[in-house]
Design a protein with these regions (language model features):
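Short, charged surface segments at domain edges that flank catalytic/cofactor-binding sites
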Residues: 1-17, 74-78
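Short coil/turn linker and secondary-structure boundary residues
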Residues: 13, 58-61
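Short, cysteine/histidine-rich loop/knuckle motifs that typically chelate Zn2+
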Residues: 16-19, 53
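Histidine-centered nuclease catalytic patch
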Residues: 19-49, 60-65, 69-70
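A generic secondary-structure signal for well-formed alpha-helical elements
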Residues: 54-58, 74
Length: 79
């Protein structure tokens, strides 16, 4: 998933949600764009690399809803 959304050649990248936390290709979490709670699936199209804090804070929210509610800079990744 890292390679698809960030690129195999990149070793670090900012979180897709907060756009602040630096993640490493070896240390990141997987967040659902559409939450499992809302019948989101485990396909690569529905998953994004995000930081631990965003993943835990998001809970069962959909990713875009979480980003908008928290007024996070990561919204640019979804427009």
């Amino acid at each position: 998933m890292w390679n698809r959304y960030i690129g195999e050649e990149k070793g670090t990248h900012l979180c897709f949600c907060c756009d602040r936390t630096i993640m490493s290709k070896f240390l990141f979490e997987v967040g659902h764009v559409i939450s499992v709670h809302d019948n989101g699936d485990l396909t690569i199209e529905n998953l994004r690399p995000i930081c631990s804090l965003c993943n835990k804070s998001m809970g069962v929210q959909n990713m875009v809803d979480f980003i908008k509610e928290q007024k996070l800079a990561g919204i640019k990744n979804f427009v």
